[in-house]
Amino acid sequence: MKPTPVRRILWVIAILIALGLLMAGLAQAQPVQITDDRGRAVALPRSPQRIVSLLPSLTESVCELEQCHRLVGVDRYSNWPDAVVGKLPKVGGGLDPSIEAIVALKPDVVLLSVSSRASDRLEALGLTVVALEPKTHADVRRVLGVVSDLLGVPRAQGSDRLWRVIDAGVQAAAQSLPPKAKNARVYFEVSRGPYAAGESSFIGESLARLGVRNVVPASLGPFPRLNPEFVVRANPDIIMIGNRSMQAMVPYPGWASMRAIRENRLCVFGPGDSDVVVRPGPR
């Protein structure tokens, strides 16, 4: 029977899909060599198939690169996507992980932050550790590339594609901002203290790309603890509050006099939205 044009198209699609799966499998079977954020070279005979992640942004990066099925354990704060919620063992936090629980999972690699104190102990037990810590927009793009390489996912189909989606989303958000909101002076509180997001933080970069001004200068560091009087003097147009700051919503002295409070210009993020805004990851 002579193939119809429709059948030819279906055959071509099937062949392309098969070739794509073959190439992906070959990439994952190749030796892997990367350098983590400690400057350490990590070499593996093949792409890791069993991964423990101790940092939510790295958990999300693995999943956004469509490799969530390789995760065998995560930290207690990894709560996205649904594929990891209640379905994977929790092995403690990034700073206080259960070494015994991690070892029992027999991971090919453990992903964690540079600041984690678990690196040396895990490596002493013979586990491979990759320490990555995105802190800026540029870091997010770079770390996505490293994770893509580690997973054997070609960057063109993995990290580069994902970054274009992220970047386009930020641009779209900036363009949707009402003209009267441009150059508004914003204070973003990440947790009680108050601890604020400065201009040099990941959040500060996001605010700048949206076209608003951060009242906390870069000279104070990425997440400085401020005297509440500092914020009163800054008198921001808008106050943004992360979920951690809502744990004890006791008014700070003098804040009732601020413009943002008087005019009820408060943006309070719930748990899910707060994670998206605060975590320097692919969401």
Regions found by a protein language model. Give the residues of each.
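Bacterial Sec-exported substrate-binding components of ABC uptake systems
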Residues: 2, 15-17, 24-59, 155-187
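Short helices/loops that flank or line small-molecule/ion binding pockets
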Residues: 99-107, 125, 226-235
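Alpha-helical, coiled-coil/dimerization segments enriched in small aliphatic residues
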Residues: 78, 197-223
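Sec-dependent N-terminal signal peptides
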Residues: 8-19
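Extracytoplasmic substrate-binding proteins
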Residues: 41, 109, 117-195, 213-218, ...
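A short, structured surface patch at a secondary-structure boundary
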Residues: 49-105, 109-115, 215
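A ligand-binding cleft/hinge motif common to bilobed small-molecule-binding domains
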Residues: 116-124, 238-258
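Short helix-initiation/N-cap motifs at beta->coil->alpha
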Residues: 37-39, 89-100, 219-228
